[in-house]
Amino acid sequence: MAKDIYFNEDARKSLLSGVEKLSNAVKVTLGPKGRNVLIDKKFGSPTVTKDGVSVAREIELENPFENMGAQLLKEVAIKTNDVAGDGTTTATVLAYAIAREGLKNVSSGINPIGIKKGIDHAVSLAAEKIRQSAKKITTKEEIAQVASISANNDSYIGEKIAEAMDKVGKDGVITVEESKTFDTTISYVEGMQFDRGYLSPYFSTNKENMSVSFDDAFILIYEKKISSIKELLPVLEKVLGTNKPLLIIAEDIEGDALAALVLNSVRGALKVCAIKSPGFGDRRKAMLEDIAVLTGGVLISEELGLTLETVEIEQLGQAKTIKVDKDNTTIINTGNKEQIKERSELIKKQIEDSTSEYDKEKLQERLAKLVGGVAVINVGAVTEVELKEKKHRVEDALSATRAAVEEGVVPGGGSTLIEVAMYLDTIDTSKLSYEEKQGFEIVKRSLEEPMRQIISNAGFEGSIYIHQIKTEKKGLGFDASSFKWVNMIESGIIDPAKVTRSALQNAASIAGLLLTTECAITDIKEEKNTSGGGGYPMDPGMGMM
């Protein structure tokens, strides 16, 4: 296919035009007075959102060169959202500001490579300053403030997220689901829960809701299948002597082994229940080892030289409470806290080393089941449109809150970026080249843009307030929702440090790419044939008589 090629100024201008269009669509959502964006859907109701990344994801431009610029900027929003869960609009505004100012300099003949080096130097110093300025958050109230701001100043959502995090801990799993009612509620699962139910309903101890409930029970954790009751007899006899219930977890339990267990359960000779092991493949063994650590037991595995016939009562796990229904099993643990902590640290290390998002998610779930349990936020709303929008806000707020717990918080409303710009003013740049100094200055000017946009969305002229904040004492900022000068941290106007830092670093990365672009190539669109159907051509000599 033939290609269309733009060089030098033409390439950069067309890319910047696309960046500007996407930035203009996204920036209207910034701040407490940010506006909504309505997105048409081919089927169903349109989506209403104030989430920058949701707006960015929808944008495709007709002009292919402009579209390339827009897609690059979209990458800033998506990457920031993936890393920090929020700050997508801030990142978009910063990227456009750096690219716009940078291209002005490139157009005047300054070497873009030098400008990029200056930008990278300034951003590196700025990111370190943001890290140093961060204040650790520990209280439930601080967590609620962060979550509220990320949920577009919805304090109810903020309180629910803080409540969930308080209950399951910072390593616990919090999931967001759609509620069947109009209300937003939280449900909790203590201990470890996994999606494996009993192998026979005859194990039920509660015939009304067909569930099994054991207190102070033993757990046999076996890696392979159990087909013969003979293998199990030694263990069953030992457990029978303690008069305690027994949960058997194995790859599968079948044949006369399952039949004998059901018979003993129905007759009341032994309180017993059998379930299949959770997970698949390598993950199955890891989860069985987790259960063993959680319950203070041993995984009975031939690799360790252990067989069912030689199992001692001390090698069985123990649980305070076990609940099993047809779909799920919940184990509330009594294991050794030191061993659980060691196992948790091992899983955390695996999360850090993993490059797969799917693996990270599964490891995070395992960690949560070990240390905290699971909280489910059920989001409710009156209409489907509102439900989608609200669920999205809750997910964003949850991600941002995790980022805040991880790296701490900084004053919000763009005031931290102004403080960072003032800090960059104090840096000695005498050893930098002229081009690098220009790049350094571009970052300083661009850091003002998010606050300027927040104030503009509130209906005021940003430049006046930015000049004023530079003369105010540290920590003060402009509250765009109440139109007052306040102490940002004390007023709860805070941003996760990770969000602010990631927004700036990702913005500078993409802006640097745009500045150093010298050629852009795209396919030439083929003209569609609009002529009539595909019949045979008429012979010119066969006209009408």
UniProtKB/Swiss-Prot annotation:
GO terms for biological process, alphabetical: protein refolding
A single GO cellular-component term on record: cytoplasm
Name of the protein in question: Chaperonin GroEL
Cellular compartments annotated: Cytoplasm
Matches recorded under Pfam families: Cpn60_TCP1 (PF00118)
Family: Belongs to the chaperonin (HSP60) family.
Record gene name: groEL
Keyword field: ATP-binding, Chaperone, Cytoplasm, Isomerase, Nucleotide-binding, Stress response
Subunit and interaction comment: Forms a cylinder of 14 subunits composed of two heptameric rings stacked back-to-back. Interacts with the co-chaperonin GroES.
Single Gene Ontology MF annotation: isomerase activity
Species assigned in the record: Borreliella afzelii (strain PKo) (Borrelia afzelii)
Family matches, as InterPro entries: Chaperonin_Cpn60_CS, Cpn60/GroEL, Cpn60/GroEL/TCP-1, GroEL-like_apical_dom_sf, GROEL-like_equatorial_sf, TCP-1-like_intermed_sf
Source superkingdom: Bacteria
